[in-house]
Structures are given as C-alpha cells and as structure tokens.
C-alpha cells in the first residue's frame, strides 16, 4: 500500500467517524421525539438502513453467485462470501433492533407475521450459507453448492419487501 493510499484511507476513516458522530447527535439531540411511539422510534434510524444494507449485500451475493456459476472464476466466489458475511451482520442487526422496537409498541417481542418470519428465514438461509462455506472441504463443489444457496436465498427478499 502506497503512502498516498494510507493517507487517503486514514482521512476516510476519520471522516466516517465524524459523520457517524454528527448523525448520532442529530438523532438523539435535534430530531424531535415522535408523539405516538416516543423515544423508541429512534431505533428506526438503525433498523431500516441495516435492512437495506442486508438486502444489498445479499443482492451482491446473488449476482456474484450467478457470475461464479457462469464464468467459474474463484474471484466471484470470494466476493459472494464477503458480501454474505456483511449481509448476515446487518440482518442480525435487523433481527435485534426490530424486537427492541416492537416490545413497547406491539406489547410483544415477536409476532409471526409474514415479514418478520421471512426475514428470519432469510437470516437462517445465509447463516447456513456461511456454515456450508466454513464446514466443508475447500473445493469447487463447495463453492457451487454455496452459489446455488446464495441464489435461492435471495429469492426471499422480494417476498419480504412485498409482504406488508
């Protein structure tokens, strides 16, 4: 890594941290408290972006898995794996922040409606994807199975989106 690249990365990290702090200040200081839901509504500033980032990450898994099966280049498999890891992190955040919001609003931590259940299924599919990647022998067969699972898993996202 060149000195210029290191400096650019350092500046980017500091700008990201500063933007995060400004965003937190805006959420907790300047944004008025919603009358019906109260302060718990502020969790939506984390919950909804986490959901979209999870969906986007799983879309990358979908595209890279198709490209891997088509071109058989390991590079696409690596991109799919990295995106799946990121997607599982954000989907986990969704499944944690959602019940925190739901308890005071609905009076229950979890309700078995279509959106919540299909989001849990999505998370389970991609956790299974990661387990497959880390528990089987290295090889093209593992990558092909994972690619198929990554493609099938993505098919749950339109169902989640339109399940309201």
Question: What spans do the regions from the language model cover?
Answer:
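Hydrophobic cores of alpha-helical transmembrane segments in multi-pass integral membrane proteins
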Residues: 9-32, 38-39, 43-106, 111-164
């Amino acid at each position: 890594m060149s000195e210029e690249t290191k400096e650019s990365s350092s500046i980017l990290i500091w700008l990201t941290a500063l933007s995060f702090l400004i965003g937190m200040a805006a959420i907790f200081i300047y944004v008025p408290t919603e009358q019906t839901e109260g302060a718990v509504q502020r969790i939506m500033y984390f919950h909804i972006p986490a959901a979209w980032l999870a969906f986007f990450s799983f879309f990358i898994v979908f595209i890279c898995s198709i490209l891997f099966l088509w071109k058989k280049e390991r590079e696409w498999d690596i991109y799919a794996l990295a995106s799946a890891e990121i997607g599982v992190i954000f989907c986990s955040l969704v499944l944690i922040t959602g019940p925190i919001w739901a308890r005071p609003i609905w009076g229950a931590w979890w309700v078995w409606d279509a959106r919540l259940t299909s989001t849990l299924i999505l998370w389970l599919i991609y956790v299974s994807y990661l387990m497959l990647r880390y528990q089987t022998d290295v090889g093209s067969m593992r990558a092909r199975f994972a690619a198929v699972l990554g493609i099938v898993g993505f098919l749950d996202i339109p169902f989640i989106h339109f399940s309201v």
